[in-house]
Swiss-Prot record:
Belongs to the transposase 27 family. Keywords: DNA recombination, Transposable element, Transposition. It comes from Shigella dysenteriae. One of its GO terms (molecular function) is transposase activity. Disulfide bonds: none annotated. This is Insertion element iso-IS1d protein InsB. NCBIfam families: transpos_IS1. It holds the Pfam family DDE_Tnp_IS1. GO terms for biological process: DNA transposition. Absolutely required for transposition of IS1.
C-alpha cells in the first residue's frame, strides 16, 4: 500500500525537439522512490498505461499538478491538486535533468532513437529506485 503518491510527466525529445517523448511516473512520498514509469506521448493512453502499472499498489492519496487528464483519470479517488504537494517529484525531475544530459532542455546531448532514449532513462531509474 502507498499512502501518498505524486504523479508527474517530464519532457524529453528524440533527434529533434519536434519529436517529443514523455516520461510519466509515480513517486512514493514516504519511501522517496519511483514506483512505476512509462514512456510515450502526452496522452490519456500513456497515462492509462501508468495507472494500470499502479493498480496493484492501492494508492490512498494521489497528488498531481493541474493537468486536466489527471483530474478525469482520478475521478472518484482522493486526489489533491496543488503545486505545493508535488515539490518532491518536481525536485526529482530536476535531479533527472542534472544526472542525464539527454533530458536537459538546452543540451548538445540528445537521444537519436526512441529505443535508446527509453533504455537509458529506464536503466537509470532501475539502478536508483527499483533495486
Amino acid at each position: 500500500m502507498i499512502v501518498c503518491a505524486e504523479m508527474d510527466e517530464q519532457w524529453g525529445y528524440v533527434g529533434a525537439k519536434s519529436r517529443q517523448r514523455w516520461l510519466f511516473y509515480a513517486y512514493d512520498r514516504l519511501r522517496k522512490t519511483v514506483v512505476a514509469h512509462v514512456f510515450g506521448e502526452r496522452t490519456m493512453a500513456t497515462l492509462g498505461r501508468l495507472m494500470s502499472l499502479l493498480s496493484p499498489f492501492d494508492v490512498v492519496i494521489w497528488m498531481t499538478d493541474g493537468w486536466p487528464l489527471y483530474e478525469s483519470r482520478l475521478k472518484g479517488k482522493l486526489h489533491v491538486i496543488r503545486k505545493r504537494y508535488t515539490q518532491r517529484i518536481e525536485r526529482h525531475n530536476l535531479n533527472l535533468r542534472q544526472h542525464l544530459a539527454r533530458l536537459g532542455r538546452k543540451s548538445l546531448s540528445f537521444s537519436k532513437s526512441v529505443e535508446l532514449h527509453d533504455k537509458v532513462i529506464g536503466h537509470y531509474l532501475n539502478i536508483k529506485h527499483y533495486q
